């Protein structure tokens, strides 16, 4: 979480914002007003629902979740029964091998029921979050075969990953 020169990790930026410190040095000037005026999501906004979900899962169900393997499901389920918070859960599950970042991904995959199977294939679509004139030029020159590329996933509601993205956004909104 230590900045590397001009760049800082997303985790560092989120933590600074949660602590009331504004990381202007690491953001483009145009982003400053957006971040300062936006509501901030608490770090623990979804922790109770994550703990509930894990406590209601069987070892087999958790073993089927993306990035879970080698008996990790047993470690997580034991810890979920003891933990009263997400921080406690991370402390009980974490190790050099199982980093907090990986564990958080697993917890949220469990919440969204994202299976190992779903994550082994290629992406169903590529979502463009932003682009300039050069990006639009490149996009228009791309062949329209293969994986769909879009800035508006609403066109692809029949794709599982688009529905998962929408569910994740809804859950995140509930946690804020």
Predicted regions and their residues:
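Active-site cores that bind ATP or allylic diphosphates and position pyrophosphate for catalysis
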Residues: 1-176
């Amino acid at each position: 979480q230590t900045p590397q020169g001009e760049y800082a990790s997303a985790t560092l930026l989120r933590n600074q914002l949660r602590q009331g410190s504004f990381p202007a040095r690491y953001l483009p000037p145009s982003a400053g007003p957006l971040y300062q005026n936006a509501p901030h999501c608490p770090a623990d906004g979804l922790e109770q629902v994550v703990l509930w979900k894990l406590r209601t899962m069987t070892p087999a169900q958790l073993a089927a979740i993306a990035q879970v393997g080698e008996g990790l499901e047993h470690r997580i389920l034991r810890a979920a029964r003891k933990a009263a918070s997400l921080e406690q859960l991370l402390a009980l599950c974490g190790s050099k091998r199982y980093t907090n970042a990986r564990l958080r991904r697993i917890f949220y995959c469990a919440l969204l029921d994202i299976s190992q199977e779903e994550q082994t294939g290629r992406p169903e679509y590529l979502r463009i979050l932003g682009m300039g004139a050069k990006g639009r030029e490149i996009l228009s020159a791309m062949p329209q075969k293969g994986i769909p590329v879009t800035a508006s996933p609403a066109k692809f509601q029949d794709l599982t990953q688009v529905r998962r993205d929408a569910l994740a956004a809804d859950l995140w909104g509930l946690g804020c």
